[in-house]
Amino acid sequence: LYNLAEVLDSYHLPRSPQLAVITNDGGVGIIAADALEECGGELSPLSDDLKGRLGRLLPRHWLADNPIDIMADADTERYSDTVRACLAAGEIDGVLVIYTPRSASDPVDVANAVISLYRGTQKPVLGVCMGGKRAAKGRRRLLANSVPAYATPEEAIKTYLYMYRYRRNIELLYETPSEVVMPDSPFKEVIKAAIQECTEVGELQLEGKYVLVLLQHYGV
């Protein structure tokens, strides 16, 4: 597993629990969407502008929705173009890139493309390489270049939401607390009179009958 402490120390932290899921397998995309919802996250809505851009990059029969299914025949260029388009979209706060063995591309090549895009953005990018030894090479490549990478969508999504909650907690710590307005005491004038009388007779602190007056008014 990717070192969570290193992930949280990164400046690639999400601004929201919304996530764009890019996959070459529609079924795996549905699994990722379900896991995201179960963990309290959301699929990022795709603007018309982003849909139009993706429509020019992807096969004509793509579903124009998130998860973004780039199809089983996706090559490295299609992966790269899709991730780049999502990172450039203002409504996207984070991207999960899923590679499955159905892909026509090499997992290491896909990993290299993701690494290049990750270095040019402050948005979080996470990778999932599913499959045997071949896919593991892609994961290792991502991890070696500080890109969080996992064997399953569920692991990646849990980490993404940890990252979001961590950022949110940091923001809350730095928020200026609102001023607490204390209600006026109903015995304010009594207290002022007792203090004034005490000072007039040369007393430097409340003693004796003055203390008793205050305690009686507060029911002590």
Task: Identify the residue ranges that each predicted region occupies.
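Peripheral docking tails and interdomain loops at the edges
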Residues: 2-23, 27-28, 33-43, 112-218
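Residues at or immediately preceding the N-termini of alpha-helices
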Residues: 76, 107, 153-154
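Glycine/threonine-rich flexible loop motifs
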Residues: 103-111
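Flexible, glycine-rich phosphate/dinucleotide-binding loops
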Residues: 52, 104, 134
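Short glycine-cluster motifs
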Residues: 15-100
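Flexible, active-site-proximal loop/turn residues at the rims of small-molecule/cofactor binding pockets
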Residues: 1, 101
